[in-house]
Amino acid sequence: MSFGGKKFRSKRQQLAYEASLAGRYQKHMNKNPFLWFGLPFCSVIVLGSFWLSEFTAVRYQQKDQKVQEMKEDDLVKMKANQRQFDIKEEYYRLQGLGEQDWEPKRIPRFKGESENVW
């Protein structure tokens, strides 16, 4: 036989517990659990999302600062400094990009480690 979730208290201890804040809360909680637990929990979730929206707004404000409308003078300067683009030239440049300056290098193994030949 067990007491379950109830803690054994003497009669005097039980009266003192019921007079305390925790005891009164437990009494109300047993009568209306949603009102005393569910509703505060849901309200904390909703209010927390409103309070945290300020932090998420900073993220979008930073992205908006990066993307700004350009003035005509800046656009003309950017076009003047732009490299000439030819699709065939880019294709041939990218074809030979990875093969020029690398060589396979064997990484040393730890002592006792197998070679794992496939």
UniProtKB/Swiss-Prot annotation:
Its main location: mitochondrion. It is found in: Mitochondrion inner membrane. It is a single-pass membrane protein. The chain crosses the membrane at residues 33-53. GO terms for cellular component: mitochondrial inner membrane. Keywords: Membrane, Mitochondrion, Mitochondrion inner membrane, Transit peptide, Transmembrane, Transmembrane helix. GO terms for biological process: mitochondrial cytochrome c oxidase assembly. Belongs to the COX16 family. Required for the assembly of the mitochondrial respiratory chain complex IV (CIV), also known as cytochrome c oxidase. May participate in merging the COX1 and COX2 assembly lines. PANTHER family: CYTOCHROME C OXIDASE ASSEMBLY PROTEIN COX16 HOMOLOG, MITOCHONDRIAL (PTHR17130:SF14), MITOCHONDRIAL OUTER MEMBRANE PROTEIN 25 (PTHR17130). This is Cytochrome c oxidase assembly protein COX16, mitochondrial. The lineage of its organism: Eukaryota, Fungi, Dikarya, Ascomycota, Saccharomycotina. The gene is COX16.
